[in-house]
A protein has these predicted regions:
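A structural boundary/capping signal
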Residues: 1-269
Length: 269
């Protein structure tokens, strides 16, 4: 199990870090099953790409295997967002998000010694390889398709702002810890939306192990505690946020929440 205080998570394999982190959050997370499944996928992929000698050929074969034969991809229809983030479920259903699919694909690629890296683009995680004809090769982890600058600019203008522009910094390699934080943030919000407050609290506490003094995460934990009617703890967290971020417009809303909690009878757990 990872200690965020004594280990440099960014130096561990991404999937290994995610599996260990999910064990902190979900006591029943089947780490051994997930690890074995990942090993099996790696061995199958190794056999599938063995005929290719060049890096770009191996990567193209892996994309073919992952998306066309194994049929990993984005979820459709009605589904719970948390289901496409838990790695055990993603491996079972083969449906995931850009982060969960990207983490699995990246794990397999790295075991095959393919020079792939994660990029936290403003709209989603993407994968990057710099060895293809010495030119940056960008891959959409949802479907394995190659991304070009035009597509990325369309994403920015459609999701961020009509005046948004693509900058070189948007395509820099992301540290694994940054990827994990992004995944956990999405998982936390999904669990809150699904009213699974106990697990959401576990996610929030895990995020605070990574960055113990983050006032925004402390605020979110306070709001989760309020939902769980742990009002005395909720107040401590919410007051911390207001004191540390007095200029944030959200502080006024949080003050109303604090006042509402103070009017209630404390429920001690």
């Amino acid at each position: 199990m990872i200690s965020f205080f004594s280990s440099d998570v960014s130096k561990l394999p991404l999937c290994e870090s995610i599996v260990a982190t999910l064990c902190l959050i979900r006591p029943d997370f089947p780490a051994d099953v997930v690890t074995k499944e990942l090993q099996n996928r790696v061995e199958e992929a190794r056999s599938y790409v063995i005929s290719e000698k060049k890096i770009d050929g191996k990567l193209k074969k892996l994309i073919e295997l992952f998306y066309s034969h194994w049929k990993f991809g984005s979820a459709t229809g009605v589904y719970k967002l948390s289901d496409v983030l838990w790695l055990d479920n993603v491996l079972k259903t083969r449906k995931g998000t850009a982060v969960s699919l990207g983490a699995i694909f990246l794990h397999i690629a790295q075991q095959l010694h393919l020079p792939l890296m994660p990029v936290i683009f403003p709209t989603q995680l993407i994968l990057r390889c710099d060895e293809f004809n010495k030119k940056m090769w960008l891959i959409n982890p949802f479907n394995g398709e190659t991304l070009d600058e035009h597509v990325l600019e369309v994403w920015l203008k459609g999701n961020i702002s009509p005046t948004a522009e693509l900058y070189k910094n948007d395509l820099k390699k992301a540290q694994y810890l940054t990827v994990i934080r992004k995944m956990l943030g999405t998982l936390k919000n999904a669990l809150i939306e699904e009213k699974n407050m106990e697990l959401a609290l576990n996610v929030s506490n895990t995020l605070l192990r990574i960055n113990p003094n983050d006032p925004y995460e402390i605020r979110d934990r306070g709001l989760i505690y309020a939902q769980l009617e742990c009002n005395h703890i909720a107040l401590t967290d919410l007051i911390y946020f207001v004191e540390h971020c007095p200029e944030d417009p959200i502080s006024e809303i949080i003050k109303i929440q604090i006042h509402s909690i103070e009017k209630k009878k404390f429920v001690l757990h």
